[in-house]
Amino acid sequence: DKICIGHQSTNSTETVDTLTETGVPVTHAKELLHTEHNGKLCATNLGNPLILDTCTIEGLIYGNPSCDMLLGGREWSYIVERPSAVNGTCYPGNVENLEELRILFSSSSSYQRVQMFPDTIWNVTYSGTSKSCSDSFYRNMRWLTQKNGNYPVQDAQYTNTRGKNILFVWGIHHPPTDTAQTNLYTRTDTTTSITTESLDRTFKPLIGPRPLVNGLIGRINYYWSVLKPGQTLRVRSNGNLIAPWFGHVLSGESHGRILKTDLNSGNCVVQCQTEKGGLNSTLPFHNISKYAFGNCPKYIGVKSLKLAIGLRNVPARSSRGLFGAIAGFIEGGWPGLVAGWYGFQHSNDQGVGMAADRDSTQKAVDKITSKVNNIVDKMNKQYEIIDHEFSEIENRLNMINNKVDDQIQDIWAYNAELLVLLENQKTLDEHDANVNNLYNKVKRALGSNAMEDGKGCFELYHKCDDQCMETIRNGTYNRRKYMEESRL
């Protein structure tokens, strides 16, 4: 009678890489890299995105009349700005610290417009318009001009009693000629001051023609600040002021992301959103976009990252494992061994049989499960690559930022790949060791009652029915019971 120790083989085509080998065939492997997305803009755990369509964020904040659909308060988890959006500041001019403004606004999760200065507070004309703004003007600012040939000093105050920060905006008009200046403001030498407990700004117009933009050779320079709870804003001007009218009460925290994309909105909720689409995944890594946000796997820029779960599938003599078990004296796997990774095959007078060794298999499975969790834990240090916005004059800063981001991502990708290579090496060697240990366990139990054949089997010196074979498998074999028969 005969009993053999062996391991499983399958028709799997899975391969993994280790520190010393590439493309090692294995019975089972787990892909750790998520590679698919739904191609849509989805809600996240923080809520729905705010999709601006034809407007930019600054168009919303300053109140471009083409963005009237956004005048009501909104909430968002992230903001989507279309690449083709044209409705920003309609009257030509620059927004000071525009990138900071966009970050500040997008980091909140909601805004509510509140009136800061009623029209009755001004004793000049407050209904200035522009053809470049659809013969209208910004919904959050008033263009103050002379009334009946007079422009007395305007002096107004507003105290924030809302209990939350208020984002407010204003502008300074720079006419193209002295004539335009005096027609609007009666004098050429004007001064505007915008002050709070923490802000002190003074402005004078720079009169002169500029290149034609939107049919205009004048400019408005745009400004913004935040009025904290309890602070008072004081506005004093005798000309050229585009005065604050409505402010935005900013509340909450969002993902703080602005996606510039033409993706369609979907009826979906995802853990993780990117500019390419949303994804849900329980895997530790993804390769969709380095600008992913939400509850995301770690981004690494590789095509595949497979963790060995099972054994070597086609063991070869030349590829010996750490203990030599699988690749050595046990020549090939058993396709019929389906209930476990390791097991026994026997032949006796009752026929042949095969059985998995559930104990050693379960211990190996537990170890593999722990291994996957450990990889997740080791890579669980939070890092996010954010698509920061820089102005055109900050190209060097932008280049440095991108270089640092790329290096961080490269380091994480290297760490992940190295960790998986190490674990794959250990897994395959541990499988070798497990088969070897099972073999030695049987060898110790049988002692002199059997002879090794050098191929992973034992020729028994006594008759061994199925019940006897089961005692060898489960570790209850009584060597003394068969010792006398074995000597014959």
Task: Identify the residue ranges that each predicted region occupies.
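Membrane-inserting hydrophobic helices used for pore formation or membrane fusion
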Residues: 6, 14-133, 137-155, 159, ...
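Function-dense linear segments that define catalytic or interfacial modules
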Residues: 261, 268-315
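Heptad-repeat coiled-coil amphipathic alpha-helices that mediate oligomerization/assembly
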Residues: 328-442, 449
